[in-house]
């Protein structure tokens, strides 16, 4: 078993029989505890986490292909969801390392706190670009491309030409936008942003539209979809994509790399807590 920098070895699958899925949707949920109870029932044979709130859900799960297929079908079709998740997109990748050790379904006030009150992203996907459209946008002269992730993620990998807002948490992003939005408008720049799976960008875009009357172009499905659907993604993607699970990082082909949590966080005092958490989760 390969030990990727921790005191105890991680669970490593002998074959790529384990898969990871990421999914989210902003949708009005009236009874979040009831929805969470149904999700707990549907994930009894899976590992990972799902957050449920009045604004929707956000999840990452791992398991065998058949179990994930059953969950995906149920989330889209189970009558107990009243069609709230019909057509929801899933981003799937094969695993070598087991991403999670347990299953958690929690009810929260928000599935993704931006740190700004009153942001409503339900039914407001904004301007979504598919991978081909995103590639064309990267070559445009009038676009500022913002990496809507934490700075340590940007350092590990990024799209060519992207700007690092230098934030340590999603809740820090509004301050970056507030400082720069007047300049973008004065220069006549279009604003585009990307994140790992798309959820950060969708919520940020809703806020920026309301606060600054600014329409934001987003990479639909995020980095994960781009890498999955673009055979030559390495032309645009530089480095590795950080993921918030025990795999740590993926290359442009969505393959796990040898990067460890210590490689990502070591030397950054502000991120020491993340390293400690990663080590703790890997040891459980």
Stretches found by the model and what they are:
Residues 119-140:
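Internal catalytic-core helix/loop-beta-alpha segment
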Residues 6-9, 14-125, 149-191, 199-284:
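Rhodanese-like catalytic fold shared by cysteine-dependent sulfurtransferases
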